[in-house]
Amino acid sequence: SLYDELIYALIADSEQALLFCEKYSPLFDFDYVYEPAEDILGLIYISCKNIDSRKATGSYYTPTKIVKKLIEKLDIASDARILDPCCGTGNFLLQLPAHVRFDQIYGNDTDTISVKITRLNMVLKYDILSVKTLYEHITEADYLASDSKTSYQYIIGNPPWGYEFSESEKEKLRKNYRTASGKNIESYDLFIEKALRNLSINGQLSFILPEAILNVKAHTPVRTAIMESNSIRYLNFLGNAFDKVQCPCIILQLIHTGKPLSTVGMEVSDCSHCTTILTNRKISAEYFSFHTTDAEYQLLEKKLRKKADYFSD
C-alpha cells in the first residue's frame, strides 16, 4: 500500500529498526490516537535532531498556534496554487483549510527525512491514491537554486533563519540575488526575494520572520525589493514565540500588486491591540515602522513639518 511504501522509505536500516522496537517495547503498549492536522512525526524528528545541526541550517519547529494564526489571515480561493518552499515536515500544509485540495498544494525542502515525513502527513490528511502525484507535489529540492518560473497565488512558511552557506554557495547566490550583496548573507532575505518572483499579480506571501527584517540596516535590500511592487497586508508582532529562542518575530503578509508599496488597508497587530492603517504613509527602505496609529502618525508628521519650516526660515 501507499502507507507501507512511505513508512519503509523512512526506515533506512530495517535491522536497526527491529532492534529499537525490541529495546523499547513498552512504547508499543500504549494506545496512540491519531490527531488530524497534528504534525507529531515532525515534532519528534526536529526534537531528536542535533541542536548544532538545527542552528547551522536555521531550522526551528514552528508552534502550531502560530501556523494557524498565519493561515487564518489568508482567504484562500478554491483553485489557488499554494507553495511552501521550505516545508520541513509539512506543518503549514497540514493547517490549510478543509476546502483546499491536495492538487493545489506544493512543497519542497532540502532535508530528506523532512520531505518523507511531509509526504506521509499529506497522505494522512488527503485522499491521495497516486504515488506519482505525491512525489511531484512534495519534492526534495533547493528552492533558492531552482530557476522555476512557476507562479503561485500563495507562498507560505517559515524560511530558514541564519543558514550557514559555504563560500561556493555564497558565490552562486550573489550572482542571482540582489539581497545577497552584503558580506553576510541572510537566508530568509533570499527566500523573500525568490518568493516575490514566483507570486502571481495579487498573489500573497506570508512568512514567519525575525522582527529584525523591519529595521536592521543589513536588510535594507530586501525592504527595497518589497517596496517596489508589493504592499504589506498584515503585520503581527509575535514577540519571542519560539521555545528557548531569544528572537522577537513577526508574521509578514505581502500582496504582490505590481505597484509601489501603499500602506492603505494594512493591518498591524500585537499581543495587546490591532489597528488598520487608512492613509498612505511615507515609508523608507531604511526602516519600516508601523507601531503608530493614523492619528499618532499625523501628529508626528505635523511636528516634523513645523520643525522643517523652522529650520528653513
Where are these regions (language model features)?
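Signature of N6-adenine DNA methyltransferases within the class I
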Residues: 62-66, 87, 93-94, 102, ...
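Class I S-adenosyl-L-methionine
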Residues: 1-124, 142, 215-222
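Short, conserved active-site loop motifs that form the nucleotide-linked donor/cofactor pocket
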Residues: 136
